[in-house]
Amino acid sequence: MSAEPEVRLTAWVHGRVQGVGFRWWTRSRALELGLTGFAANKPDGRVQVVAQGSREDCERLLGLLEGGDTPGRVDKVIADWSDAREQITGFHER
C-alpha cells in the first residue's frame, strides 16, 4: 500500500443528473477505483460527489465525471480538494 496521504474530492455535478442512474454509475466507478464516499442528490438538481482515496484515483474519478459517457447530461463539474477528514467505509448513494 502506498504511503501517499488520502485526499478528499468534493465535486458538484450540474446538469440533468438526477433520475437517470447517475449516482449508481458514480458509485460503480468509485468502487472500481477503490474509493470511499458517497453521491447525493441535492434539492437544486445537482449531485454532490464526495470521494476519498489516493489523489491519482480521485483525479481519475473526476475525469470520468467530466467525460461524456455518464448517464444523463453533465453541464459542468466544480471540484474542491482537501485532506481526507474522516474515515468513510464503502461508497454509498444518498
Curated annotation (Swiss-Prot):
The keyword Magnesium does not apply. It is an enzyme of class 3 (hydrolase). Disulfide bonds: none annotated. The active site is at residues 23, 41. Residues 8-94 form the Acylphosphatase-like domain. Its EC number is 3.6.1.7. Belongs to the acylphosphatase family. This is Acylphosphatase. It comes from Mycobacterium sp. (strain KMS). The gene is acyP.
